[in-house]
From Swiss-Prot:
The gene is gcH3. Belongs to the histone H3 family. Residues 1-46 are annotated as: Disordered. The keyword rRNA-binding does not apply. This is Histone H3-like 2. Disulfide bonds: none annotated. It comes from Lilium longiflorum (Trumpet lily).
Amino acid sequence: MARMKHTARMSTGGKAPRKQLASKALRKAPPPPTKGVKQPTTTTSGKWRFARFHRKLPFQGLVRKIWQDLKTHLRFKNHSVPPLEEVTEVYPCQTIGGCY
């Protein structure tokens, strides 16, 4: 290994001065209490997505159960279930609509 040269380093004269702690304490202070009734939180986009996904689960379970009776070991992609749901809703409406 090659020999490394040691360069002289200037001393800083001890520790560097620190910031005042009062400003840090002010930032961490709790917010002032609000008066009146607390507003309910609005739903975020993530919650809305979960609600839409959760709504599709019962129909998807029904489709899986029906197909398990016909054939075993079938897998469904997420985008294949909504068209089935749409057709399932439209067919009875058209059938009943043509009766009267």
